[in-house]
From Swiss-Prot:
Protein name, UniProt field: Acetylornithine aminotransferase
Compartments where found: Cytoplasm
CDD domains to which the protein is assigned, alphabetical: OAT_like
Phylogenetic placement of the source organism: Bacteria, Bacillati, Bacillota, Bacilli, Bacillales
Cofactor(s) listed in the protein's UniProt record: pyridoxal 5'-phosphate
Manner of cofactor binding, per the entry note: Binds 1 pyridoxal phosphate per subunit.
Gene: argD
Amino acid sequence: MTSHLFQTYGRRTIEFVKGTGTKVIDNKGKEYLDFTSGIGVCNLGHCHPTVLKGVQEQLDDIWHISNLFTNSLQEEVASLLTENRALDYVFFCNSGAEANEAALKLARKHTGKSLVVTCQQSFHGRTFGTMSATGQDKVKEGFGPLLPSFLHIPFNDIKALEEVMNEEVAAVMVEVVQGEGGVIPVDLSFLKEIETLCNKFGSLFIIDEVQTGIGRTGTLFAYEQVGIEPDIVTVAKALGNGIPVGAMIGGKELGTSFTAGSHGSTFGGNYIAMAAAKEVLQVSKKPSFLKEVQEKGEYVLEKLQEELQHVECIQNIRGKGLMIGIECKHEVASFIEQLENEGLLVLQAGPNVIRLLPPLIVTNEELEQAVYIIKKVVCTKNVSII
């Protein structure tokens, strides 16, 4: 069949028609264990009953109205996002790229400066601003010239950070775990030094939690585990559990820098998105839920290390919460395909890392099942190495 779609994705031929919890079913009736969560989107699993109920009820009332009018649902969700943290204001949008664009605009407007420091191998989006911020050449090929005033330093390199920081820097933007860059957690000392230098030079500290946010690492936001206070946090992906919604969250001192007309979004924060986000947050903020995520993350990481430690092709296993990377000594495309054949959906992060992003509602039994399948595949001599 002739496709009328731009070929912007390296799509697999499989098509899914049903999803419930951690499982999805293709159009031939085969069931899969989904350890992609739609690339970290469906943290509560597919068709979560609480989120489904909230969205269905909202569909009967009102779907969308202009942001020129009051929306109390936005206020409710904003309160849930800022509760018990040193962040006071929220701007709602539709995606992680939009949230990061808003953060970059706010940083420049608030500080009056233009230079932004980010990290090599980072990923912040595909708009011109966020693409310029991203530290991966493959994302930028063919789209130049990009926006000036972005510096990219090696991830976790304090010396490189110290060399570029000065009074001209508007902001430093960093991920707590580089997801697209290979599932590489940030060093605590690196984050602390960013905070110190931003305070010293009057720069804003932006943390991109688009993939790590909403409980993925065992706290609502990953940065909460390391005792720092960023000026801006961005979030999207899991905030709507499949309904497009993003948010840029800023400190109180930034509140006067975005005024009427200085930024906006037609669809951002509409009623359907807010209905989903409200239910997602009410589930994801529960201490018992987050504790289980931490425990399951520790459990599966330990199981993977135990089962794969002597496998020749495995170089490293790392992660934070239920965000895990299995680094191999060669490219993993053939592994990804074979895992799919065995009924396990996983992701690739760079050429040689298998990325696991299971729904946070996953059971220990399902984690064990995934570990078994992964071990079976990586130990199979018939898997081609490319």
